């Protein structure tokens, strides 16, 4: 089994409560040290650690040295390894594994590629297509609609002692300054990472963190007590709720304000009205409902004075509709005449839209007092860039 971890692997320990600008900084050099690279025809092998090897095959012999949405760093201290040709096979050996690839044999298959690992109390041989029967499971994008057991998909750790991460279709991250996402080449290339760690799971996580980038530490308040209920509270009812926590000596750290903070057009389950994006009208919204929150700045200031953080529910899929307070500015900044009432789609993969979205919509609300956002369901799981999930991005 090939672990299609995609961006979730790189974000293994990240939480939605971490502001986007607070990502931890660390070594991010996508091109590996040439001394770690072994080229064999249209195949390339990069020894990243003694337990982690990158395996690439390209029909054109054109290999990827840019960062991807999963892997941002390949420049690490070159581990001790040896390489040689033996009886028509390219052999790469580290202290933890021995890789063998049949010279000139084309795409990676079970007939031309194998990795023997003898580390962490595991002695096994991996080949492409091998089933990972001991995988411990991965992550799930959303729990909406889940009413029982759910398949979590493959994760980073396995009792088999190895994990294969397929990064062949992950979008690239390119550009100077803040990198941006770019569609991967349409060529049918293979770009795999094999972690051979035996039962040393800490080593597996450590090695993967080196290539996927440092994970931001969740803030202290994220581990506290949260209040969340899908209910149309007024600001006074929210304040009474907070006072009740104090009155009964129950700790509270985060106040979650569900979607009725914005205009919902009296949305109820079964509502059939659709917005211009084709979604149920009222799910997406950015304009305060003054019937419930007549003075949002004062309300959030009061919450902060109680020592709490406040988060607002957000369903972004419908973009910026013409009834939003922010619409005229967003439309102009996106080159749309506001008089047309043409909605602005949620094309978050477009760098210009993303800048406008944060400058004109998100950041002004944060200046009012929003600490972070609850990114809720509704958005699709595809974008205009293959392999890019809008929830993750």
PLM regions and their residue ranges:
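Bacterial N-terminal signal peptides
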Residues: 6-18
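Boundary at the C-terminal end of the N-terminal hydrophobic targeting segment
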Residues: 20-24
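Short, solvent-exposed loop/turn and secondary-structure capping segments
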Residues: 66-68, 102-104, 111-113, 166-168, ...
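A low-complexity, Ser/Thr/Gly/Pro-enriched, surface-exposed linker/loop concept
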Residues: 51-87
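Mature N-terminal segment immediately following signal peptide/propeptide cleavage
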Residues: 33-57
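Short, Gly/Pro- and small/polar-rich lid/capping loops
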Residues: 25-32
């Amino acid at each position: 089994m090939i672990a299609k971890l995609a961006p979730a692997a790189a974000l293994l320990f990240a939480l939605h409560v971490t502001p986007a600008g607070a990502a931890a900084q660390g070594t991010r050099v996508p091109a590996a040290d040439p001394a770690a690279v072994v080229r064999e025809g249209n195949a390339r092998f990069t020894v990243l650690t003694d337990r982690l090897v990158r395996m690439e095959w390209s029909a054109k012999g054109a290999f990827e040295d840019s960062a991807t949405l999963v892997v941002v760093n390949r420049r690490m201290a070159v581990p001790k390894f040896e390489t040689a040709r033996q009886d028509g096979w390219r052999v790469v050996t580290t202290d933890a594994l021995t890789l063998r690839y049949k010279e000139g044999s084309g795409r990676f298959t079970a007939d031309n590629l194998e990795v023997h690992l003898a580390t962490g109390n595991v002695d096994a041989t991996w080949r492409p297509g091998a089933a990972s029967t001991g995988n411990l499971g991965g992550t799930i994008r959303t729990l909406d609609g889940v009413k029982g057991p759910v398949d979590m998909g493959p994760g980073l750790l396995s009792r088999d002692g190895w994990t294969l991460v397929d990064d062949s279709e992950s979008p690239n991250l390119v550009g100077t300054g803040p990198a941006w996402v770019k569609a991967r080449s349409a060529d049918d290339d293979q770009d795999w990472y094999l972690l051979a760690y035996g039962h040393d799971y800490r080593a597996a996580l450590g090695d993967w963190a080196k290539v996927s980038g440092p994970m931001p530490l969740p803030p202290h308040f994220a581990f506290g007590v949260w209040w969340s209920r899908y209910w149309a509270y007024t600001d006074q009812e929210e304040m009474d709720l907070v006072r009740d926590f104090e009155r009964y000596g129950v700790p509270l750290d985060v106040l979650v304000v569900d979607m009725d903070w914005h205009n919902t057009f009296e949305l109820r389950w079964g509502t059939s009205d659709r917005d211009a994006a084709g979604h149920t009208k009222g799910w997406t919204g950015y304009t305060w409902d003054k019937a419930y929150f007549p003075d949002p700045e004062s309300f959030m200031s009061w919450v902060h004075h109680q020592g709490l953080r406040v988060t607002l529910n957000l369903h972004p899929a419908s973009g910026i509709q013409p009834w939003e307070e922010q619409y005229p500015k967003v439309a102009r900044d996106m080159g749309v005449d506001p008089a047309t009432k043409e909605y602005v789609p949620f094309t978050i993969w477009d760098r210009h839209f993303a800048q406008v979205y944060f400058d004109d919509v998100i950041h002004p609300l944060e200046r009012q007092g929003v600490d972070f956002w609850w990114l809720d369901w509704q958005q699709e799981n595809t974008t205009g860039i293959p392999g890019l999930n809008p929830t993750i991005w």
